[in-house]
Amino acid sequence: MSDQRKEKKLNETNWIINFDKIEDSTRRNYFSVLPQENRLMEHFAEAFVINKPKGRVGGDGFWLHKHDDDVYLALFTCVGEGHLASMMIRIYMNALKKMVEGYSIDFPGSILQFLHREVQARFKDKNNILLNTNANVGIVKLNTSSKKMEFAGANMDLLQVINNEVKIVEGEKNQVGENTETRHSYSSNSLQDAENSSFYLCSSGVFNLIGGPDFKKLSMNQLGDYLLQNKELDLTSQKQLAEQYLTTWTGANRQNDDIMVIGFRA
């Protein structure tokens, strides 16, 4: 082998090693910034998290915060996937940290409004950036004493299983963080009979999964019907069944998006 070819081979090997180190570091950072599943269980009667990035890192994340008797839970799906979407997760997490440390904002709809303005302001003068700054977000507020619950969504809905019924609590159609002049507003919805319900927040990737008997995208109604069939089970068992259901639905097809599902009971 000539010296030039040896040098080229060495450079390629070094590039692969360095890239793998970056990948490993990004993966560690991605998972370290997210709360652990057991933290959810400290604040909800039952809870689970399914987090399956398409690649080594993902663009789905969640945030948990407790203030007095109120617990706040947010799931956000940053547009795109991989490293760039993972970077946006940190930006959204930092914006939420800034909010709780310096502002008295307690309604889920108001939190979405803050997030939208904060991300817009951060990227206002960066028209040529490669990042997609917008995200789908769902936020739940639970008062642990009264068991009252509120929800607000930015292009994200909430599944509620209650008695023998599946309800879809709709959020607004607008995302947060879009770099447009369109005026955004987000309302908070009070949830009925929260103490006797199971709730599920799902990233958009769940409903991008293609498969099933008709080789189509999974719908929220289909997932809701499956969860309803298993409503008597504890959420630990439901998590295992939900993972199996999503895998079976996809079948031999490749996972085409990041997936995150959070289930919880008040």
For the regions a protein language model found, what residue spans apply to each?
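Acidic beta-to-alpha connecting loop that harbors the catalytic carboxylate
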Residues: 79, 205-206
